[in-house]
From Swiss-Prot:
GO molecular function: ATP binding; tRNA(Ile)-lysidine synthase activity
Nucleotide-binding among keywords: yes
GO cellular component, one term: cytoplasm
Protein's UniProt name: tRNA(Ile)-lysidine synthase
CDD domains: TilS_N (cd01992)
Organism: Bacillus subtilis (strain 168)
Sites where the protein binds ATP: S25, G26, G27, P28, D29, S30
Length: 472
């Protein structure tokens, strides 16, 4: 009880007149928290229990719910419950069961907070949980706020989440239950080695407690220091990213990569994390600091243009000083690129739209190639060739036609989607003459009667594993 009072005083929290939702599983931690808050507040606050049956353990799960309901009835407490098919939710969302259970719980808690216009959601995470969480994050390579573990107080729903037990241990909670004659339910799955947290709890935590009995307090101090440092760095990062971000929508963010890479590394990492937090509804559990560093290395050293795949369908499209983070299917807004075909050897240019252009010397031309193949020679056009995006005023001298035609009009005639036009490849020779619009139109500079010994065959085709970088 003293620990709860100390927690409330430290964080300047007043429970008098408040509505407090308590997440109650029926286990010793949540039963102790419900009892402590009810005893502390009496009738000066409205304490409400909220229980979720995840339906993982059949009849046992339902018995947990009945146990919580019976306790609340005896204590004259309101009890809100929900039975959720978490397994089905996990399959639908592509999540593991633990992540799915957490999603379902917090969605339910938010609904109950809204229903009662609650001020607080009290959760029974304790000091041992905090140590486990921070170690698991560290082992995964998490940086920034995530490494600080669970926050003692944070905004949520109509109010705030509070975790009054973060400075006490599981052993102290069990002692409180025994001292106050509290019954509780036991979840046998907490003893299984199937879950990462359980393995940390059974192997790592006992060693740390043996070395330092107050390890939970030390970790909590580290957590608070990391949080304070992170808040300062986040503030700096937001100021700098306002200069780095050039445009954004609900599904995409475009940045100037040169300006990002000019920032100190701690701000670079946090800048990318801010973008991810903005774009992802929930950052995938598979995401780690490795992905952020991978992006930064690629942005600096990966060539002028390309595409990087992130989890859950997020792509980063790079073109010179621009990087576009997007969930859109190639609806890339004005992402220019430019590659060269020297003509000296067989070459391949891989394009950001998922296609490539191959240049092959002395090759036989396909029997039916249409506009996806262009045949020429160094006698017919001047090398090097350039593959680029369109420019204002572009015109092409079409095969079988007098004069020239605007590239813009060709795109309109072909009903090319507006979002694809700025990224459609155009091939020019060394003088800047447009010789080919791959897949759409050819110029007068194609020659089908060139001998094999002189011919260069250009082919435009789809490439599934696009990474958008020219190579020879």
């Amino acid at each position: 009880m003293k620990s709860v009072k100390d927690f409330l005083n430290k964080h300047n929290l007043t429970l008098k007149g408040a509505t407090i939702i308590v997440g109650v599983s029926g286990g010793p931690d949540s039963m102790a928290l419900l009892h402590a808050l009810h005893t502390l507040c009496g009738r000066s606050a409205n304490v409400i229990a909220a229980h979720v049956d995840h339906r993982f353990r059949g009849a046992e799960s339902e018995e947990d719910m009945r146990f919580v309901q019976a306790y609340c009835k005896a204590e004259q407490l309101v009890c809100e419950t929900a039975q959720i098919n978490v397994t089905a939710y996990a399959q639908e969302k592509g999540l593991n069961k633990q992540a799915a259970a957490r999603d379902c719980r917090y969605q339910f808690f938010e609904e109950i907070m809204s229903k009662h216009q609650a001020d607080y959601l009290a959760l029974a995470h304790h000091g041992d949980d905090q140590v486990e969480t921070m170690l698991m994050k560290l082992a995964k390579g998490t940086l920034g706020t995530g490494l600080a573990g669970m926050q003692p107080v944070r905004r949520f729903g109509t109010g705030r989440i509070i975790r009054p037990f973060l400075t006490i241990t599981k052993e102290e909670i069990l002692h409180y239950c025994h001292e106050n004659g509290l019954s509780y339910r036991t979840d046998e799955s907490n003893a299984k080695d199937d879950y990462t947290r359980n393995r940390f709890r059974k192997t790592v935590l006992p060693f740390l407690k043996q070395e330092s009995p107050d390890v939970h307090k030390r970790f909590q101090k580290v957590s608070e220091a990391l949080t304070e440092d992170e808040q300062f760095l986040q503030s700096l990062t937001k100021d700098e990213m306002n200069k780095v971000i050039t445009s954004q929508s609900n599904t995409s963010v475009e940045i100037n990569s040169s300006q990002l890479l000019a920032l100190p590394m701690p701000l670079q990492r946090r800048g990318v994390q801010l973008i991810l937090n903005y774009l992802y509804e929930n950052v995938p559990s598979s995401f780690s600091a490795h992905h952020i560093q991978q992006f930064l290395d690629w942005a600096e050293n990966g060539g002028p243009s390309g595409v990087l795949d992130f989890p859950k369908g997020l792509k980063v499209v790079k073109s010179y000083q621009t990087c576009l983070f997007t969930f859109e299917q190639w609806q890339c807004k004005n992402v220019p690129f430019e590659y060269q075909i020297s003509g000296a050897a067989d070459e391949t240019a891989v394009l950001p739209n998922g296609y490539l252009i191959e240049a092959r010397h002395y090759a036989d031309s396909p029997e039916e190639h249409g506009n996806a193949v262009f045949i020429t020679s160094e006698k017919k056009v001047r090398f090097p060739l350039t593959i680029r995006t369109r420019k204002a005023g572009d015109r092409i001298k079409l095969k079988g036609m007098n004069g020239s035609k605007k590239v813009k009009d060709i795109f309109i005639d072909k009903k090319l989607p507006l979002q694809e036009r700025d990224n459609w490849p155009i091939v020019t020779d060394a003088s800047g003459e447009i010789i080919w619009i791959p897949g759409l139109k050819k110029s007068i500079f194609e020659d089908l009667v060139i001998p094999n010994s002189d011919r260069i065959v250009l082919q435009y085709r789809q490439h599934e594993k696009c990474r958008g970088q020219a190579k020879s």
